[in-house]
Amino acid sequence: MLDIPLSESLQHPGTRVAVNIIISIAAIALVRVIGSRWLTQYHLRALPLVNGLGLFESGKRAKGSFLFNAQGLLDEGYAKSSKAFRVQTDSEQVVVLAPECASEIRNDDRFSFTNLLAEDFLAHIPAFVNFSPHNGLNDMANDVITKKLNPALGLVTPDLSAEATLTFRDHWTDSTEWHSVNVKGTILEIVARLSSRVFLGPELCRNPAWLRITVDYTTNLFFGVVALKKWRSFLHPLVWRFVPEVRKVRQQIEEAIQLIQPVVDKRHAESRSSAASSGKKDQTLYDLCSYPEYIEPLRDELVTVLKESGMTKAGLFKLKLMDSFMKESQRFKPGAMIMMRRKVMEDVTLSNGVFLPRGVQVGIPLRSHFNPKAYSDPDKFDGYRYVKMADDPEKEVFRHFVTTSQEHMGFGFGKHSCPGRFFAANEVKVALCHILLKYDFKLAEGPKPNVMKMGWVLISDPMTNLMIKRREGIDESILE
């Protein structure tokens, strides 16, 4: 091998050309990135930025105000503009649109949900590659849910109820004495078992290692993304391997594959030889404790309906008061402050005159959940609200828990509404039937549950405990 000094090699004409080309390409790429961002900000300059920075301020203040005071930023933005305004999040500027824009963008292909997820969850990082719009996983999951799971809800409902009997016995016990349980912790474990019973069957739904991953993965994913976003974006590909929260996510994915693969192999062999909600459950429980006057009417309804129709998909559909209570609970306390988050894939001018340049993120606030034009006395919790809509032909279609609309976007709205909401609704109802029929419950002494806020995300209080005891002298056969 020739040992040519670096100084001499750089004098070679071919080397100088190669270096110049590399520098030119890097410079062009840098100019394009900076230019694109500058152009985007130039086009958005007409929209108020509620947590903008002063000349000598760092981005930490803006990010901190978003993470810990997002609702205050939304209120400030509403006061400044009724059409649209900007919020600096922990990673990007998001344009918050007026609620009436929901119908306009809901089915517009220029507003991409999958590309938003990829950008939000850093899909270019191997630990988060599941969110990439290019690997087909999103399309596959949607197909499984819409084409396989939703049509089979009638078949899986008995399995859900049977597993609910076992998991409530394990986590809430059969004790007839008052005792305390942590709502968030036990409900997460119960949801994990019920969902795993449907998606994976009995082989894994009671496996402690699998249930631990199922319970912890979403939380670890969230904190992994937040931790990596503390670094400059150009450093993400270099530092992700050394961020403990991100490494934990990658490790859990590998553990999950090791647990699932033997089950998949077994089912493939069987096939050759013979030719898948938690936040909704705990928040609903908190609301039942806050409004205990609904407990007996709900019990009376489920006993009447299940005696007549059994624990079936049809029987669950007939639980009108339960459905209404769940929807009202979600109206008051959804999972986020804004919904219908999208990435704009090409320049768009909305009907209200707001111009959105390609590449910007947008979202719709949930102020419509408290719109007096849509709801009478909107600031009052009314568990019968959607039952009453059955008497209004114009509103009847919107009363169901799984129905989305501009006035109720708990599951989103439009073509990207949550495809798993039908299964989630059935799962929540099965669990509530078991809870209402089998247990007396009340909030433990102490502070009332508070909704925790982290950026846009709303999380039911993880520290809240319930006092529960098993009811006696009841007919449990209606749950079979």
From Swiss-Prot:
Belongs to the cytochrome P450 family. Its EC number is 1.-.-.-. InterPro entries: Cyt_P450, Cyt_P450_CS, Cyt_P450_E_grp-IV, Cyt_P450_sf. Heme binds at C418. It comes from Arthrinium sp. Pfam families: p450. The keyword Metal-binding applies. Pathway: Secondary metabolite biosynthesis; terpenoid biosynthesis. Keywords: Heme, Iron, Membrane, Metal-binding, Monooxygenase, Oxidoreductase, Transmembrane, Transmembrane helix. It is a single-pass membrane protein. This is Cytochrome P450 monooxygenase atnM. Cytochrome P450 monooxygenase; part of the gene cluster that mediates the biosynthesis of the meroterpenoids arthripenoids. The pathway begins with the HR-PKS atnH that catalyzes two chain-extension steps to form a reduced triketide, which then primes the SAT domain in the NR-PKS atnG to initiate three more cycles of extension to give a linear hexaketide corresponding to the polyketide part of arthripenoids. GO terms for biological process: secondary metabolic process; terpenoid biosynthetic process. GO terms for cellular component: membrane. The lineage of its organism: Eukaryota, Fungi, Dikarya, Ascomycota, Pezizomycotina. Its cofactor is heme. It is found in: Membrane. One of its GO terms (molecular function) is oxidoreductase activity, acting on paired donors, with incorporation or reduction of molecular oxygen.
